Amino acid sequence: MVSLEKNDHLMLARQLPLKSVALILAGGRGTRLKDLTNKRAKPAVHFGGKFRIIDFALSNCINSGIRRMGVITQYQSHTLVQHIQRGWSFFNEEMNEFVDLLPAQQRMKGENWYRGTADAVTQNLDIIRRYKAEYVVILAGDHIYKQDYSRMLIDHVEKGARCTVACMPVPIEEASAFGVMAVDENDKIIEFVEKPANPPSMPNDPGKSLASMGIYVFDADYLYELLEEDDRDENSSHDFGKDLIPKITEAGLAYAHPFPLSCVQSDPDAEPYWRDVGTLEAYWKANLDLASVVPELDMYDRNWPIRTYNESLPPAKFVQDRSGSHGMTLNSLVSGGCVISGSVVVQSVLFSRVRVNSFCNIDSAVLLPEVWVGRSCRLRRCVIDRACVIPEGMVIGENAEEDARRFYRSEEGIVLVTREMLRKLGHKQER
């Protein structure tokens, strides 16, 4: 393990990102989000009033100084590709800055798509080698968080690791959804199990397990060697968590990086924020938290901006209708192009170009772009998919049986509404 002085840290914080390439795994379907991902990959799902989920990983890269990125796509990639082309095309290739789109190459005989997360990188190795990077940062494109990857790169170099895995404690009852590790006093990973049925607890905190976040830093040459070896293994599932990380752990070359060391927060005393918004309830809850008085995730931090594609839209408008009812909102996010006419919106998130007509009451709802709400509607504890036309007088979120019959209702009572569901009920979706 190498001990570095403060000046060395500052120098490495500038140099290491320039020697790195980030590969963002963005091909996931996100089946737990149900119909919300029928026509788009999970990283392309809208979030926070104006963003897409993948914007967080991409913004973290830029803010960390990494300006060479590859986005590995697969499932329903059109929306994702379109978003990146529109919103992330400002790089200067002459300065060796880029976002490369890497679709499934379908090079394997008898295989049409990526066989696992590691195979997604393997199939693009010929392209990735051309980047001539010293370090490769592997990221999931479907998580919400702010992280300075330069700090993780410094930790990787300082510990003399060949592979570094970002980790954080999670409640032991939730740990079965993650790779779980045990570490020694130097953060060397001494045991790693992917999604165990009975997760081991942390020695100093029996109620929690130390979970992998699916964020990795590799020495580039070591990663390429591992991937080629894994590709030849017929018994491998070609997955980082299931195959590569346990193998590296067994070789004694994997180290853990505690997420709090690189998590970017405005309040240093706040809990580190990282969310896998993979279920409808988690997605709904994370969106609504942004509308709270003091949200857990600070989206207003000028030092760590989250970038996205910005349409040229007029400001949101709140108007009084002809009956004298005022358009009002409280504890909500309302994006550009929205019009709220004579209705009340409380603790909700409205994406761009949403129109709410008179006499409506919207409470704890997430309305994706271009939703049109007819007069006298009541929407509560729901997610309304893009461009839905909610007919006049419709009530959602007040009758569990009725909601489950017409739409998708989660066990927690969150209702998902899509255009297809509304069409099946006989409601036209064209205006």
UniProtKB/Swiss-Prot annotation:
Sequence positions that bind alpha-D-glucose 1-phosphate:
114, 179, 194-195, 212
Q: Does the keyword Transferase apply?
A: yes
> Out of the domains of life, which is the source?
Bacteria
Q: Which Pfam families match?
A: Hexapep_GlmU (PF24894), NTP_transferase (PF00483)
Residues the entry annotates as binding beta-D-fructose 1,6-bisphosphate: 39, 419-423, 429-431
Q: Known Gene3D superfamilies for this protein?
A: Hexapeptide repeat proteins, Spore Coat Polysaccharide Biosynthesis Protein SpsA, Chain A
E.C. number, please? 2.7.7.27
The record's catalysed reaction(s) read: alpha-D-glucose 1-phosphate + ATP + H(+) = ADP-alpha-D-glucose + diphosphate
Q: Where is this site: Could play a key role in the communication between the regulatory and the substrate sites?
A: 74, 113
The positions annotated for binding AMP are 40, 46, 52, 130, 370, 386
Q: Which UniProt keywords apply?
A: Allosteric enzyme, ATP-binding, Carbohydrate metabolism, Glycogen biosynthesis, Glycogen metabolism, Nucleotide-binding, Nucleotidyltransferase, Transferase
| GO MF entries | ATP binding; glucose-1-phosphate adenylyltransferase activity
UniProt feature coiled coil, ranges: none
Explain what switches its activity on or off, per the activity regulation comment. Allosterically activated by fructose-1,6-bisphosphate (F16BP) and inhibited by AMP.
> A GO biological process this protein is involved in?
glycogen biosynthetic process
- UniProt pathway: Glycan biosynthesis; glycogen biosynthesis
Q: Which family does it belong to?
A: Belongs to the bacterial/plant glucose-1-phosphate adenylyltransferase family.
Cross-referenced PANTHER family: GLUCOSE-1-PHOSPHATE ADENYLYLTRANSFERASE, GLUCOSE-1-PHOSPHATE ADENYLYLTRANSFERASE-RELATED
Oligomer and partners: Homotetramer.
What job does this protein perform? Involved in the biosynthesis of ADP-glucose, a building block required for the elongation reactions to produce glycogen. Catalyzes the reaction between ATP and alpha-D-glucose 1-phosphate (G1P) to produce pyrophosphate and ADP-Glc.
Q: What is this protein called?
A: Glucose-1-phosphate adenylyltransferase
- UniProt source species: Escherichia coli O45:K1 (strain S88 / ExPEC)
